[in-house]
Regions:
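PRY/SPRY (B30.2) beta-sandwich protein-interaction domains
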Residues: 1-269
């Protein structure tokens, strides 16, 4: 039997071996034997009372002592241009929602996202509409934008020109110098939040010569955040109006910058 193209219970092989749903609802996925999208990695987590659900694309934090609940993705990269999205689904007014990239050093050393020199993150502080902050090497930089529950944060990593950009609800954020991000600006890195270190410099050390996508959460209360690496869903909720994606690889809420693609086995190959 063959199930494809959204026909989740209808056999497309011509043999009539149709399926029936025994209970619950089905969530369509873009994953296939020839193209697997990145997910969050249940074997690469530190801190907090976190669990993963919904295809390992949702991080659920339960009430605990104040901890950074930190989890990496399953696919890494050391070149190319990559885009994904994180949605702050729910939480308390004191929540910090974080997203970015890191080497494996963070989880290996039980660090939080942005604590190491080869780790780059943006955190949105919900309380009172507080401004977001970026971190690398444990150093905090306040940014001129805030985000909170319901917002969708886009991440664009240009690993050819060593730059990282963040968007909020489809608009590229301005960095600490008040320059709006332009992910397609190439070597000029216009509005990039950081010039990231070249992963090739770590090629032969214990932490590997690549970056991983990461999400992190800080607070003592419950919260939920979901990632969309290209399957077109935040948890079980489909994107409301898919943006353009010239690569044709993956479905996202907002437009994928020209030259960028989803982090998947097809994208990597």
């Amino acid at each position: 039997f063959i199930l494809k193209d959204g026909n989740s219970v209808t056999d497309q092989s011509g043999r009539g071996n149709n399926w029936t749903v025994g209970g619950g609802t089905l969530t369509k996925t873009e994953d296939s034997p020839s193209n697997n999208f990145c997910t969050l990695n249940s074997l690469d987590m530190v801190y907090g009372n976190s669990s993963l659900s919904q295809g390992n694309n949702t991080q659920n934090q339960t009430a605990a002592s104040n901890h950074y609940a930190f989890v990496n993705g399953t696919l890494g990269f050391n070149s190319g241009k990559w885009y994904w999205e994180m949605k702050c689904v729910s939480g308390h007014s004191d929540n910090w929602y974080g997203v970015g990239i890191t080497s494996t050093q963070c989880t290996a050393n039980n660090n939080w996202l942005g604590q190491n020199a080869d780790s780059y993150a943006i955190y949105g502080y919900s309380y009172g509409g507080g401004l977001a902050s970026t971190y690398t090497g444990g150093t905090r930089t306040n940014q001129g934008v805030s985000f909170t529950a319901g917002d969708i944060i886009g991440v664009a990593v240009d690993c050819d020109n060593m730059a990282i950009y963040f968007s909020k609800n489809g608009t590229w954020m301005s960095n600490a110098s008040s320059v709006q991000g332009v992910p397609t600006s190439g070597s000029s890195k216009t509005g990039s939040f950081y010039t990231i270190s070249d992963p090739a410099t770590r090629k032969y050390n214990a932490y590997g010569g690549f970056y991983l996508p990461s999400v992190c959460y800080y607070d003592a209360r419950t919260a939920v955040q979901s990632v969309n690496f290209g399957n077109g869903y935040f948890g079980t909720t489909a994107v409301s109006s898919a943006g353009t994606n010239a690569s044709g690889n993956g479905i996202f809420e907002y437009d994928v910058p020209t030259g960028y693609t989803a982090l998947s086995t097809k994208g990597l190959n």
